Amino acid sequence: MRLLRASAVMTTLLLLLAACSDSGSGGEMLSELGEPEGELNLVIWAGYAEDGSAYPEFDWVTPFEDETGCQVNATVQADSATGVQMLQSGEYDGGSFSGNATDRLMAGGDVAPVNVDLLENYDAVFDGLKNQPHNSLDGVPYGVPHGRGPNLLAWNTDEVDAQTSQSGLWEDAANYEGQLSLFDSPDFIADASLHLMATQPDLGITNPYQLNQDQFDAAIALLEEQFTHNPQFWDGNTFADQITQFAAGDITIGTTWQYQVNSLLAESAPIDSVKPEEGATGWSDTWMISSQAAHPNCMYLWMDHMMSAEANGQATVYFGEAPTSQAACDYAESIAPGHCEQTHATDEAYWDDIWYWSTAREDCADDDDATTCVDYDGWVEAWTTLRGS
């Protein structure tokens, strides 16, 4: 028996679609929806489109397909840069993207603005997730929220004392030679600069993603020192390997997501985690529709589905993210008691010191023409050099 059942909202929306003419294009904001096209091609983060094949109790794809007739074809992106390239290929109707991709997609015209009046579940989304820099442009929504979470610090409680700050990754890294676990992405440079915000305030860093040359050089120097201690790496495709490494005792401390922590706790592994007192980087992911979408009606139906209590509740429990509405929280609690408290879904103050992934820009993402920052190409080049050293 499937855990999830199609909602009355979805049924109502489909009836409305049948009464409307085919929109025919995903290039501009839609004024109305037409008949579902029968197919939906998505770029996703791993775990964002589960059909019950991995765990029968987690299935929000099959009910969507049964109710709408839109057959979901999902392709996993390894990282945000790959996701951007995939959507730009024109082969996908949309996808789930983090802030370090959404700003590029909006700026490049690769995604279309979203008519949220056509999405019945949008009104219920927490206000703190709406009209944010990572999902809106000039006050116009370019997507709908999926979930959010911090990049946590985790450690093996048998080997490491309780942590409150990131110092274990930086100043104390020599204590964990060969057993550090780090996120393998240029975006990890922001974790270094966030630590410098707290420990070297004279650098004047005010945004860990927008760094002038001196600030950037300081972050790279910190990483160069850290890399001398032979860290191990994981990314959006290999986070399961981090679970295995923690469970086996091959790593003792590192950055992680709630998903890995929950998986390890379920195995009774000696693991604990914290949002460091300096704050943390993190993500707030968004479902967006391609400006070249071949199946825009199915994409709109999917975006609305992913804000429903059942689908969002399941998806955020599955990945250890904060649900996007009170209704989704209530559903999440019914299948995973304590989930919304654990993920701070309704505690907006918790997110005040979480810096969602964003793209480094030459103009420093501000209105001061006198400031110049190292752009993302510079971050990629530096990270490639670091990883090759």
Briefly describe each language-model feature range.
Residues 43-56, 96-245:
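Extracytoplasmic ligand-binding site segments that recognize negatively charged/polar headgroups
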Residues 20, 27-105:
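Early extracytoplasmic/lumenal segment of secretory-pathway proteins
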